[in-house]
Structures are given as C-alpha cells and as structure tokens.
Regions:
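An N-cap/entry alpha-helix motif that binds or orients negatively charged groups
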Residues: 1-82, 363-386
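Short, solvent-exposed loop/turn segments at secondary-structure boundaries
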Residues: 99-100, 128, 183-186, 326-327
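Alpha/beta enzyme core
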Residues: 106-111, 139-147, 152-293, 299-319
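Active-site cofactor/substrate anionic-group-binding motifs, chiefly glycine-
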Residues: 76-123
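Conserved active-site-proximal phosphate/metal-binding subdomains
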Residues: 3-10, 15, 28-31, 229, ...
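A gly/proline- and charged-residue-enriched helix-loop-helix capping module
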Residues: 112-150
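Secondary-structure boundary/capping motif
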Residues: 97-98, 125-129, 217, 323
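"Short basic amphipathic alpha-helical interaction patches in structured regions
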Residues: 100-107, 130-133, 162-163
Length: 386
C-alpha cells in the first residue's frame, strides 16, 4: 500500500467512525513508505547518487600494522562498557503492533549483545494500559543496556517512572521542536524545556542522554545541555527518518513540504563540535559524550561517525526495515554481520580501538566540507592528523 493510500485509509477510518489508527502505528507505516520513496529516488538518480555520509572518506594505507583478531570493538557509553560501538536506537512503542516490534528488537539485542533504546514511553506514562508495549523490552532483554525515552514535557516524577518501567540503564530525552511544530496535535511552547531537562537530570538516578530526532544539534545546543548536567548528546542528524515529512503527510494540506531538508546531518554536527572552544564540558568539569545517529545504513557509516568523534552510533530505520521486511532471523544476522564488518573496517584503517579510530586521517568533501569551512573547521588538519 502506498503512502497516499495509507493516508487516505487513515482519513477514511476517521471519517467513518471506525477505530482511529494509532499515531505510533501511523508513524511506522509512513516511515517505511518514505524510506521506500527515498530508495527509489536514489536508484533513479543512478549509482553515483550520494548519501549524507558519502562526503566523509578515509586515506588508505597499504600496511594497517595490526591483526584483525587484535581489534577491540568495545566502547564506553554513560560509564558502561558496550561490546560494539553501535546500538538499536529509539523507535516506537505504544500500540499492540509496536509492542510486537519492540519485543523482537529487544530479543535481537539480547541475542547479539547490542544496546537498545525504546521509543518514547510518554504514551505509557499517560495511559498505563500501554505500559506492556514497553515492558516487553526488558522482559526480552534482561541483561542488555537499555535506554528509556521521554519528551521534555514529562515531569521529574514521570521521568523516574520511565526509568522504572523498563529498569533502564540510562534515560534519553528527545528534543523535537521541528516535529512538534509540524505535527497537527504537537506542542507549541518550548520555553520550559531546558529547565525541565535540568530538573530531570537532578531527579533521576541514571545518566541522561539528550537526543534530537533527525535534525541535528549545534554547539550552542550542546552548551545549553552541558549546563544542565546531561551526560551525553545524540546529534541525530538529517537524512534518515524524517519526522517533518512524516508529520506533514498527516496534515490535510501537507503545506510544510518545503521543510524536508531542514537541519544538519550527523557528520556536519560532529564536525561543528570539533571547532576549538566548542562547549563540550559539563558543569561538573567532565566532557559531554557525543553519540551519533541519522541516515546510518552501513557499517562504514558507523566508522565514519566514530572517526569524527562519536563514542557510539545509533541505528533506527535500517534495522527496523530489516525486521519488517525480512524478519527476526534476518535482523539477528544483520547485527552479527555489522559487528564483524566494523571489526574488519577498523583493521583496514589500522585502528585497534575506537580511540585510535578517532586519530586516523579523514577527508571531508562536498557540501559537508562547505558547511564545515563556513563554521570554522580546519579540514586540512583533520586530513593529516595521523
């Protein structure tokens, strides 16, 4: 079923008195449909059609100097060791359908040793009947590193409940003003968000991660977050799941189509944060940890993000598509394959650890280089830093 027919079906149900389509289900369906449209557009543009990460390249050296078996793919996130430097990022929950998706994602995470974040648990905090669609995550991944997810509209008490709901190891707070403003029923007042984030940081017993939802973060945003004591920031850049497009498809006139390209890519964000004096230090004096996500579709994209300073990389749309298109076993195989390919790519670059990967030469070209130069990034130094 095409997106237009999906949308017409939603409208018809609403007008006929039929049970309304759950917004979370609608988001999943629209995200999958838009993913298909992007893939078709890229295919039509030819094999050379660039993705948002294609501007980031490496200098090949013929003698890596290390053995593949000696490569350590582990990383530390929020003070905890992760076996691999990528994770299943926040997606969904809040309906019967998305509860099943969450259960499968969690089972796959548990089977492969990959960390996972839930989608926003805010619906379950408002309606306890939806709590089971999130509890299945911990039930299916009892030993995994799990992040719960809320909006900055939630109170400190609700934030604590979100952590308790899945016995979370960390709490993501998603910030999504662009999505909210295009969403027909979205929030319109963001004046209290930063103060609320600070209150939540003080009020919960787990590390807090602030995450964009596909539009990127600026150094000013990171400075404001750092001042509130947040442990990590997921830059979540443009180019992957696009919630402006998703919410615009839910509008009768679809009048915000011109905002489809809003925001910065993850690569642009990570480069922007490398400018000398970028505010990466929390009030405690410890650095804010950078995580990356947004249009990550291959293990090479993971390596690119790590080389630009991310400690770990979140993947949502790609893993969801594998699960919905090819099934659970295919997702488990994909997670295993990514782990092995990350190790292979680190070997090729002569980096035996993630820390060493962040010292290799990186070449930045195209529109990403133009953005970086305008923002004052020394790209020549980045290309010769080894």
């Amino acid at each position: 079923m095409s997106i237009e027919r999906d949308r017409a079906h939603v409208a018809a149900q609403a007008g006929s008195g039929a049970a309304p389509v759950n917004r979370k289900d609608e988001h999943v369906d629209l995200a999958q449909g838009l993913r298909g449209e992007r893939a078709a557009a890229a295919s039509g543009a030819g094999a050379g059609h660039p993705g948002v990460w294609e501007d980031v390249r490496f200098v090949h050296h013929s003698f890596p100097g290390i053995a593949r078996d000696a490569v350590d793919t582990s990383t530390v996130v929020c003070g905890r060791d992760w076996a691999v430097p990528f994770h299943i990022n926040a997606m969904t929950g809040g309906s019967e359908k998305t509860g099943r998706i969450n259960a499968d994602l969690a089972r796959a995470a548990a089977q492969t040793g990959v960390a996972m974040a839930t989608g926003s648990v805010s619906p379950a905090l408002r309606d306890p009947e939806l709590a089971g669609t999130f509890r299945v995550v911990r039930e299916n991944a009892p030993e995994a590193f799990l992040m719960s997810n809320i909006s900055p509209e939630m109170t400190v008490e609700q934030a604590g409940a979100a952590v308790e709901l899945i016995d979370a190891d960390a709490l993501q707070i998603h910030v999504n003003p662009a999505q909210e403003l295009v969403m027909p029923e979205g929030d319109r007042d963001f004046s209290h968000w930063l103060d609320r984030i600070g209150e939540i940081v003080e009020g919960v017993d787990v590390p807090v991660v602030v995450k964009e939802v596909g539009f990127g973060v600026s150094p000013r945003t990171v400075a404001e977050i750092a001042a509130r004591g947040v442990v990590a920031v997921d830059v979540s850049g443009r180019g992957g799941t696009n919630f402006i497009d998703i919410e615009n498809r839910r509008r009768e006139k679809q009048e915000y189509a011109y905002l489809s390209g809003w925001g910065q890519t993850a690569a642009e964000c990570l480069l922007d944060l490398q400018v000398e004096g970028a505010p990466l230090v929390r009030t405690s004096g410890s650095p804010v940890q950078m995580l990356a996500s947004g249009a990550v579709s291959t293990p090479l994209d993971v390596i690119r993000a790590l080389a630009l300073g991310a400690s770990a990389v979140g993947v949502s749309g790609h893993f969801l598509n594998v699960l919905l298109t090819d099934g659970y076993d295919a997702l488990v195989e994909e997670l295993h394959d990514w782990t092995e390919q990350v190790r292979t790519l680190m070997t090729l670059l002569g980096a035996s650890t993630v820390a060493e990967l962040q010292k290799v030469d990186v070449l930045v070209t195209g529109s990403t280089a133009e953005f970086a130069r305008l923002r004052g990034v020394d790209l020549a130094a980045l290309a010769r830093r080894s």
